[in-house]
Amino acid sequence: MTSVAHAKHDAHGSEGAHHAPMSFWQKYIFSTDHKIIGIQFLFVSLFFLLVGGLLAMQIRWQLGFPGKPMPGGGILPETMAPGGVFLPEYYIQLVTMHGTFMVFFAIMPLLVGVYANFLIPLKLGAHDMAFPRINMWSFWLALLAGLIMLAGFFVPDGAPRAGWTMYA
């Protein structure tokens, strides 16, 4: 009878089977894991929910105290609110951007990004999404689109002025 000497390490698998540890950027920022992407969508949509809420507070200030300067409104450019008093064009921008941010950058990412990325694959028992890189790009493009929309306040012509009918 022959005896086989086993190595002291785990004999089930090759040495090359282990992956190198992922960096913070690979694991949490540019991740293809559906759970991490769902959490990213959660934080970004909560940020845009805060932005939309701040826009709503400005709308309500104008409705409650028309023609009065808003507290802290001095930080707004003169093209939007000279002396903290809202111009009519800026008010329409607020209404348009509030609705756009709340519908397209807060509510939809919460439903589609968080629910579809985080919960549904776990409930189905799937290990990952079908196309994880496309899933990652969908998050980054949604974030980029929201930041570009937010930057619309800082261009010379201002943000879109379509009113509430644009998203209704």
Where in the sequence are the language-model features?
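...captures the hydrophobic TM-helix bundle architecture rather than a specific catalytic motif
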Residues: M1-A168
